[in-house]
């Protein structure tokens, strides 16, 4: 019995240390301000919504907040969230592989225009359609890449948020006169 208790404690201790190590992996400071300034300039140049923008920092792992809704007028983050990425390729919870290929189940980098909010495949889950604006994400519509409420850190390429954060995002985007841009970068 003692050997099993000691073995169990050692295993638990190893798991705890490893888990803590994985959670702090890539805990670098987030330079949201400079990325937000770049996104704001892009939005103004292209004629998109210059009030809000969404940044997705795929350099951070999916156990960290990496989706940021930025209010350009007040120069601040108004929402931050965990954000899942695609499970395709060699993606893990800690690192995403990227592809624009149909059927890849990978996330794609680049700028997206947020489209209409709709039900996700006749289920009670809501989602925002995304239009890829760059060569790296031009297949977003054919691939059905969305921002959706979801469970877990991996998706089929969509940007998935916890349900409460999705509801908050929906509230922010509701009634805005122009399309908001998402910029996913690594």
Question: Where are the language model's segments positioned?
Answer:
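N-terminal Sec-pathway targeting helices
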Residues: 1-14
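Hydrophobic alpha-helical membrane-insertion segments, chiefly the h-region
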Residues: 13-24
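Cell wall/extracellular polymer interaction/catalysis modules
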Residues: 22-156, 163-186
């Amino acid at each position: 019995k003692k050997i099993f208790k000691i073995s169990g404690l050692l295993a638990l201790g190893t798991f705890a240390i490893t888990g803590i190590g994985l959670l702090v992996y890539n805990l670098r400071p987030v330079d949201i301000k400079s990325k937000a300034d770049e996104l704001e300039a892009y939005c103004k140049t292209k004629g998109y919504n210059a009030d809000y923008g969404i940044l997705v920092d795929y350099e951070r792992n999916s156990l960290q907040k990496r989706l940021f809704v930025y209010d350009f007028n007040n120069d601040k983050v108004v929402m931050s969230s965990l954000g899942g990425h695609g499970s395709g390729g060699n993606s893990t919870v800690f690192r995403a592989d990227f592809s624009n290929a149909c059927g890849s189940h990978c996330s794609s980098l680049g700028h997206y225009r947020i489209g209409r909010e709709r039900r996700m495949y006749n289920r009670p889950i809501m989602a925002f359609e995304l239009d890829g604006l760059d060569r790296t994400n031009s297949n977003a519509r054919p691939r059905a890449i969305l921002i959706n409420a979801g469970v877990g850190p991996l998706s089929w390429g969509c940007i998935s948020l916890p349900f409460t954060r999705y509801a908050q995002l929906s509230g922010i985007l509701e009634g805005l006169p122009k399309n908001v841009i998402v910029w996913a970068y690594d």
